A protein has these predicted regions:
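Amphipathic alpha-helical interaction segments
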Residues: 1-187
Length: 187
């Protein structure tokens, strides 16, 4: 059995179709849909995952994403609630992805508008939110690379990083990519 069939067996064709149709529940971080998406992400080729998430980043409404990551909007702070170095991990991955993209303020994080601190271990949730918003709006490929790395290395952080709407977009894109690839592979 090939990788695609292994993934289909683990996730289930019905779950993939549910993701593709945008009918998954990403409201609750512990939902079965969230766990299935994390499993799919862990099994994907990192480059394919990065490409799909970069395309998804371009579809995320910038205001909706900003509202998700900005501390205090809607009385939430999803990045600030992360424990065990999760915030610093997201900050380091984002900054590294932007530096690798190598253009504009991304290669010089101190030039990101409003950013107070560029040391990932000392950044607060507001600083990480500024970097995330900047990456999502200005460098979607770097944002996709960061999301892929976070999703594969620390999948539990992905919901706080992306938010439910972006998770739903990513799940639909990943399922569509997987279903398309499955149709191309020999049975």
């Amino acid at each position: 059995m090939g990788l695609l069939q292994d993934i289909a067996a683990a996730i289930g064709d019905d779950k993939l179709k549910q993701f593709q149709q945008g009918e998954a529940d990403f409201e609750d971080q512990g939902s079965s849909d969230q766990k299935a998406l994390q499993d799919l992400i862990k099994r994907m080729n990192p480059k394919d995952l990065q490409d799909v998430l970069a395309k998804s980043a371009k579809q995320i409404d910038p205001q909706e994403y900003s509202d998700h990551v900005t501390p205090g909007v809607g009385d939430t702070d999803p990045l600030g609630q992360l424990k065990g170095g999760g915030l610093a991990s997201i900050a380091a991955v984002l900054l590294n992805s932007l530096k690798q993209a190598g253009s504009g303020a991304g290669s010089q994080p101190s030039k990101i508008p409003g950013l107070q601190n560029t040391d990932p271990s000392a950044m607060n949730s507001g600083d990480v939110a500024k970097v995330a918003r900047y990456a999502q709006e200005n460098h979607p490929d770097a944002f996709g690379k960061a999301a892929a790395e976070i999703g594969q290395q620390q999948p539990g952080l992905l919901h706080s990083f992306l938010g439910k709407s972006a998770m739903a977009l990513a799940a639909a894109a990943l399922a569509s990519h997987f279903i398309k690839m499955d149709r191309k592979s020999p049975k």
